[in-house]
């Protein structure tokens, strides 16, 4: 079987949002290979930097963990400077022959900033503080934007509702959520 005829990995929805001084990253637990669900309880959201930074990753698992390790190293080199650490990681990701082949995206956030990191060298800060990445990311993003201004809904409630909407639309997203907050 040639590499191009192998089924591709799918199965991540990551959502990051801010409301009322809180930041939340939520991720579903599904990993699929082609049309087959391989795992339903993967943990794609983590706290790093001594618990002061949230990370959610989408893409090939080994690639995502490689990038997570690299981000942690950059954070050790630039403590308390999430944006700088992300820019340094993006530079490496873009220029290093090994890293530029990695297929993953990351949503990262601390108490002050939320960022998307891509393999194209992008470090993006959304103007509304809401990020959606992965196969169901756009569904979760749209749902979160619709819910964000509703009084009485806190950041975690919005994240859970938006992720449930994404899980109801995207076949590569399940309702088994991990939610971390600061």
UniProtKB/Swiss-Prot annotation:
Signal peptide: none
Pfam family, one: Proteasome
CDD domains on file: protease_HslV (cd01913)
Catalytic activity as recorded in UniProt: ATP-dependent cleavage of peptide bonds with broad specificity
PROSITE patterns cross-referenced by the UniProt entry: PROTEASOME_BETA_2 (PS51476)
Alphabetical list of Gene3D superfamilies matching this protein: Glutamine Phosphoribosylpyrophosphate, subunit 1, domain 1
Recorded GO MF terms: metal ion binding; threonine-type endopeptidase activity
Chief localization: cytoplasm
BP terms from Gene Ontology: proteolysis involved in protein catabolic process
Catalytic class of the enzyme: hydrolase
Activity regulation: Allosterically activated by HslU binding.
EC number(s) from the headed UniProt entry: 3.4.25.2
GO cellular component terms attached to this protein's record: HslUV protease complex; proteasome core complex
Location of the protein in the cell: Cytoplasm
Residues annotated as catalytic: 12
Sequence similarity: Belongs to the peptidase T1B family. HslV subfamily.
Protein name: ATP-dependent protease subunit HslV
Organism the protein comes from: Paramagnetospirillum magneticum (strain ATCC 700264 / AMB-1) (Magnetospirillum magneticum)
Phylogenetic placement of the source organism: Bacteria, Pseudomonadati, Pseudomonadota, Alphaproteobacteria, Rhodospirillales
């Amino acid at each position: 079987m040639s590499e191009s005829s192998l089924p591709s990995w799918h199965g991540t929805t990551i959502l990051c949002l801010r409301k009322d001084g809180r930041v939340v990253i939520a991720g579903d637990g599904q990993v699929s290979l082609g049309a087959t669900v391989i795992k339903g309880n993967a943990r794609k959201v983590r706290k790093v930097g001594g618990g002061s930074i949230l990370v959610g990753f989408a893409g090939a698992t080994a690639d995502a963990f490689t990038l997570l390790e690299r981000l942690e190293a950059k954070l050790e080199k630039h403590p308390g400077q999430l944006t700088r650490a992300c820019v340094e990681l993006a530079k490496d990701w873009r220029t290093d022959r090994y890293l530029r082949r990695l297929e993953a995206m990351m949503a990262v956030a601390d108490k002050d900033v939320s960022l998307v990191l891509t393999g194209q060298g992008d470090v993006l800060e959304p103007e509304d503080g809401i990020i959606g990445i992965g196969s169901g990311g756009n569904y979760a993003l749209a749902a979160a934007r619709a819910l964000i201004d509703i009084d009485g809904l806190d950041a975690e409630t919005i994240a859970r509702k938006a992720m449930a909407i994404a899980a109801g639309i995207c076949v590569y997203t399940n309702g088994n959520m991990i939610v971390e907050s600061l």
